[in-house]
Amino acid sequence: MDRLAQDYSLEITYKSYYLRPDIPPEGIVRPLKDGEKVGDSLTGHIGEVAAEAGLTMRRAPLTPNTRMAFEASEFAKVKGLFEQFHRACYRALWEDGVDLGQLSVLLHLGEQVGLDAQEMKNILDTGHYESQAKEQYDEALSMGVTGIPSFIIGGYFFSGAQSYETFKKVVEMVKNPLQLL
């Protein structure tokens, strides 16, 4: 997404989507496929697209409850540190297999990117951004989002891990609608 934004001078707006609201606060153990181990690189389409984008995605041991992470992300947005916090959360989950449902993890990641841990803790303890995260989730549902990642570019909705070339085609289509004829 960074490359696309730079190549086309796009503004990207990230929104929270609570993929699995049924996950308990302690998370759930991720089932492994035959021969798979925690920490293995993801394979298939997701692994290929991640590798193409220069991202590492490893099999995490746990599917975390991400409610607090979404609220922490809203806090990071207000402080102008969303992208840094988002990247730190991505690395923690997909590279290091860390549980993003743990307050201590989120506070540590926040501190790493320059957020005040005590202020973040107070925000998370009070549920200050809970309604905003819920509104974003409801908005996504109303748009037909059922999974992540999902994208809306110029009114076109698509979901799933996509290559840079796919994004590029969509942006070109939106920029030059007459090419569709």
Which residue stretches match the model-derived regions?
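Short, charge-patterned binding micro-sites
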Residues: S16-G27
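Short, structured active-site "lid" loops
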Residues: R30-E52
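Dinucleotide-binding Rossmann-like beta1-alpha1 core, especially the glycine-rich loop
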Residues: K33, A60-P64, E74
